[in-house]
């Protein structure tokens, strides 16, 4: 069977082995043990299940988040870098928050789109090719009733910018192996 095939191709596979039953884990919830609150300046990300236990400053821009089965717990450095730059943009264009169009391409859990809303932006679009991610975005949006609701749609990088759709600020916290082949629609998606 399978062991014979492995031994043929991998001479160092041990002859002795042990069978063990693997306990099924609730992967949808197991990650929660590792997700911690995070803040940068005014912006605060709080795991939904920690909401009652975390105090924030009075003027904090708070986003409650449960990534579920979508990418985007807010723990990755690139997500935090995007959030920091989002705040820099907000600070530099504070008088234009009502009219600035923000696009979160590959929005995952919606953490950056919801952060844009928490920071005062009003016109926000998030899209992701994964329908489950968009379901999570809508759920997170509902949990943040204090925020202006971003629009979330299922679309890949080509369709997300189809029809000439552009933003003043485009966030694309996506791996480079996806970004590089799709750089043309991303560049066209930024207003000149």
Language model segments and positions:
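N-terminal auxiliary segments of SAM/dcSAM-dependent transferases
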Residues: 1-56
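A short helix-to-beta-strand connector/capping loop
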Residues: 12-15, 59, 146-150
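A short, charged helix-loop
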Residues: 57-67
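A short glycine-rich, Lys/Arg-flanked "PGG" loop and its adjoining helix->strand segment in the class I
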Residues: 183-191
